[in-house]
UniProtKB/Swiss-Prot annotation:
UniProt cross-references to InterPro entries, sorted A to Z: ATPase_E_C (IPR038495), ATPase_V1_Esu (IPR002842)
Gene Ontology biological process terms in this record: proton motive force-driven plasma membrane ATP synthesis
Organism: Picrophilus torridus (strain ATCC 700027 / DSM 9790 / JCM 10055 / NBRC 100828 / KAW 2/3)
Subcellular location, record wording: Cell membrane
Residues annotated as signal peptide: none
A GO term, aspect molecular function: proton-transporting ATP synthase activity, rotational mechanism
Membrane-topology descriptor: Peripheral membrane protein
Superkingdom as given in the UniProt entry: Archaea
Major localisation: membrane
The gene coding this protein: atpE
Family: Belongs to the V-ATPase E subunit family.
GO cellular component, one term: plasma membrane
Keyword terms of this UniProt record: ATP synthesis, Cell membrane, Hydrogen ion transport, Ion transport, Membrane, Transport
Annotated function: Component of the A-type ATP synthase that produces ATP from ADP in the presence of a proton gradient across the membrane.
Protein name: A-type ATP synthase subunit E
Length: 182
């Protein structure tokens, strides 16, 4: 064998080994690519599902927040309506002193006080109302209605209009809340 043949033989052997190594590593590279592509696809699917679940959860949270905010706004509006209704009721009750029925109401208060506390009870009323009631004493703190004390001062009836309103205010508020349409 000549030197040229030996070199050819070595070159051929080298080329065959290079080709064999290339084939072997090409297969490995292809397998790695497929494995990586599969993992990438799996990860993409996982995160796509996770994203959809997160979006669904976020949407649910936002819907719940909107419902809560809506209820809160409705409740606040109802509170405003009830407050306005109570203010109007208070205004009308306090202005009953200007009505034609007020003298009759005042007489009824006095009669109840006398029946409950006795003939000798002390009655206090506003200056203008005291003039309408026999033996009543004027009290500038009273804007309408009366306060009556038993002779021994152990019992009292408070028929002042603002006290009456305070006593019925919670019931009125409940009534208004129940009758407000949603």
């Amino acid at each position: 064998m000549s030197l040229a043949d030996i070199i050819k033989d070595i070159d051929k052997s080298r080329e065959e080994q290079i080709s064999k190594i290339n084939d072997e590593y090409s297969k490995r590279i292809e397998e790695l690519k497929k494995s990586c592509d599969s993992r990438i696809q799996s990860i993409k699917e996982y995160y796509e599902k996770k994203k959809e679940a997160d979006i669904k959860t976020l949407k649910k949270v936002q819907e719940d927040k909107i419902k809560i905010d809506s209820k809160s706004i409705k409740m606040e509006k109802r509170r405003e309506i009830v407050k306005d209704a109570l203010d109007i009721s208070y205004y009308h009750l306090m202005n009953i002193t200007k009505s034609k029925r007020y003298d009759s109401i005042l007489n009824s208060m006095v009669s109840t006080a006398i029946k409950t506390l006795g003939e000798d009870c002390e009655i206090f009323a506003s200056e203008s109302d005291a003039k309408k009631i026999n033996n009543a004493k004027a009290d500038h703190k009273i804007n309408g209605g009366i306060i009556a004390y038993s002779k021994d001062k152990k019992r009292m009836l408070d028929f002042r209009l603002n006290s009456i309103f305070e006593n019925i205010k919670d019931d009125l508020a409940s009534y208004f809340y129940e009758n407000i349409e949603e």
